[in-house]
Amino acid sequence: NEADLPFRWGHLLTGPIAIEGAMPGDVLEVRIDAVEPLADWGFNAVEPFDGTLPHDFIMSYRVLSHIGVDRASRTARLPWGTTLPLNPFFGVMGVAPPPEYGEISSREPRKHGGNLDNRRLVAGTTVFFPVWAEGALFTCGDGHGLQGDGEVCVTALEMALEGRFTFVLHKAGSVAERTLPRAESPSHLISMGFDADLDEALRIAVREMISMVCERSTLGRTEA
């Protein structure tokens, strides 16, 4: 029998994973130890009336592209023959949202993380999440074989990935307070901002970067 349930848009995710001792106000450090492809294919989809340019590509059907993946050479071959290097990462990573958010989908990124779609969050990078609920409840998924600076057509190279993570819990007061996810690679600091207004999201990300630079140096906000 078919259940009469409301449709909830969302991603394929693994979790939630409870972190022992995590409480609101703590910071969860997530070390991305490894991200590996699990399949020899992926796909990209262009949806009708969706994405960054919904009125530039007017069609009544979905354009679905099968993309072959060579795991040995870590490359993907597009249908027209272009070969690109893989850069696998999980599009969705986050913890449980603040209770006042209520029930939400995985589509919008907010201060708990979520649908970050940040191609720089690859193996070797560490992400810091503010904890909003007991146990933190880490979740990840939405595997991407590679992606540009965002999903202008709403998808990247969507594919199955396997990840390995190390979790480090920082109790409240032991590190600087966090209100947004931020990340560090071996060579870069990575700030993020989330808002329905892209200009405001940019301002938030710049303020976050200023704070990150100041915390790691003797510079003041103006110099940073």
Features from the language model and the residues they span:
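Short, conserved secondary-structure segments in the cores of folded domains
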Residues: 8, 15-18, 117
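Short, well-ordered loop/turn sites that connect or cap secondary structure elements
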Residues: 19-22, 121
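A generic structural signal for residues embedded in beta-strands
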Residues: 27-30, 129
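Intrinsically disordered, low-complexity linker/loop segments enriched in Gly/Pro
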Residues: 34-123, 128
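Conserved mixed alpha/beta catalytic, RNA-binding, or beta-rich assembly cores of soluble enzyme
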Residues: 86-115, 119-199, 210
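Extended, compositionally biased non-globular segments
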Residues: 193-222
